């Protein structure tokens, strides 16, 4: 059944998949199209997933959000396309290395099929170099704003725009 639901309800619809406290590692990327080759990489990856808790979320972008100019807000990637979110989860802390390696290896195998952009909310803490991709054409402007309003980088516990970095 398809129906309109309030945003808070939609935003919690998959909470049951994410047990509180369960270790996990995410990687995500935009794709202009989901080619047969990319789908093949995903099928192979999930055939060798380290646990049965690993997930793939595919989000469709575009529609009404695509009518906003890329420079109107900090978020520029409004054109149609897909965002894939690889989620590796495990219950035994001893499986951490394998879970993280699986997500990274799968992400690397998908690289030839990815668009050159990233979704800010899904960047893991170790993906500093992709922050520029996440903000795209707005990155240099955001660095200047950060230098002006947060030169000491007080607000850095996020997908950080470092004011000390050259724009």
What residues fall within each predicted segment?
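Soluble FAD-dependent oxygen oxidases
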Residues: 1-167
């Amino acid at each position: 059944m398809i129906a309109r639901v309030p945003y808070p309800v939609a935003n919690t619809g998959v909470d049951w998949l994410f047990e509180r406290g369960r270790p996990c590692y995410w990687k995500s990327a935009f794709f202009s199209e989901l080619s047969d080759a990319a789908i093949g990489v995903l099928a192979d990856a999930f055939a060798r997933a380290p646990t049965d808790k690993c997930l793939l979320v595919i989000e469709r972008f575009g529609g009404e959000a695509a009518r906003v100019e890329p420079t109107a807000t900090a978020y520029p990637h409004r054109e149609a396309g897909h965002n894939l979110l690889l989620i590796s989860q495990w219950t035994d802390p001893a499986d951490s290395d394998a879970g993280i390696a699986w997500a990274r290896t799968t992400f690397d195998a998908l690289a030839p099929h990815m668009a050159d952009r990233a979704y800010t909310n899904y960047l893991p803490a170790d993906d500093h170099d992709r922050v520029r991709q996440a903000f795209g054409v707005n990155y240099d402007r955001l660095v200047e704003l950060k230098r002006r309003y947060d030169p000491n980088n007080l607000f850095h516990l996020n997908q950080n725009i470092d004011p000390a970095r050259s724009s």
